[in-house]
Design a protein with these regions (language model features):
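Acidic, Mg2+-coordinating phosphoryl-transfer loop and its flanking beta/alpha structural elements
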Residues: 190-217
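A metal-dependent, Asp-based hydrolase signature
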Residues: 56-104
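Substrate-recognition "cap/lid" segment bordering the active-site pocket of phosphatases
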Residues: 108-116, 121, 135, 140-192, ...
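Active-site neighborhood of HAD-like aspartate-dependent phosphohydrolases
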Residues: 2-56
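Short, acidic loop-to-helix structural element flanking the phosphoryl-transfer center
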Residues: 6, 73-77, 92-100, 104-136
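Hydrophobic alpha-helical core bundles mediating ligand binding, dimerization, or RNAP-core interactions
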Residues: 25-36, 54-58, 80, 103-110, ...
Length: 217
């Protein structure tokens, strides 16, 4: 139809936008705490307290990772090592070994958790039916983000999953956004970034000339 506006190309963040990172992470942490940590750590330490401290330290590590101060391989065990320190547990050899084991177990377990943000499937299905091309643009690790997509049922709705690992740049770096345009043939005025992170998703997209949708439930 003459004059009909082309449907926007929608680029979704994954964690905390579609995939319920907090609930899935806590489910995985609860399981690995009971399996690996509870037999070793003081009986007075509850899983709830462990998770509370972990979430604080994990966010600090992710900020450092996004700033280029940590590598992926450094982040995975370090967030658990710092959790132990935050709990006041002495940093002796066994604790470093436990932190390494928990880091490996978490990455193996968490991606297979399947809780989504409420109504996520219904929303992306409706958008797909309306003719939007849809993609994922995430700072998460390549190997785990694809597992999340497949196991949670999101995969069929998205043409390409772009990860910072594969791109070589993390949001909000402009190269992350320009790479997506180059690969999809989209242009800034047709591209919309939808995500929960104000700095990475919204401001990053704004600086690249994209439209933005801030998911802030």
């Amino acid at each position: 139809m003459k004059g009909q506006q082309k449907p926007s190309d929608l680029f979704f963040d994954l964690d905390r936008t579609l995939w319920d990172f907090d609930l899935n992470s806590r489910e995985a942490l609860h399981a690995i705490f009971e399996e690996l940590a509870a037999p070793i750590l003081p009986a007075s330490l509850t899983v709830a307290h462990f998770i509370d401290v972990y979430e604080v330290e994990n966010e600090k590590c992710w900020r450092a990772y996004r700033a280029g101060e940590l590598t992926q391989s450094e982040l995975r065990p370090l967030r658990f090592q710092r959790t132990m320190e935050g709990l006041g547990i002495p940093a002796f050899k066994e604790m470093h070994s436990l932190a390494d084991s928990m880091g490996e177990a978490y990455v193996k377990r968490a991606p297979y958790c399947t809780r989504l943000i409420p109504d996520a499937i219904e929303v992306v299905r409706t958008l797909k039916e309306r003719g939007h091309r849809m993609f994922i643009l995430t700072n998460g690790f390549d190997e785990v983000q694809h597992i999340k997509m497949k196991n949670s049922g999101l995969d069929p709705f998205f043409e390409i999953v772009f990860t910072s690992d594969a791109i070589g740049h993390k949001k909000p770096h402009p190269e992350a956004f320009s790479h997506c345009l180059n690969q999809t043939g989209s242009i800034p005025r047709h591209a919309v970034m939808i995500g929960d992170d104000l700095e990475c998703d919204v401001i990053g997209a704004l600086k690249s000339g994209w439209r933005q949708g801030h998911f802030n439930p």
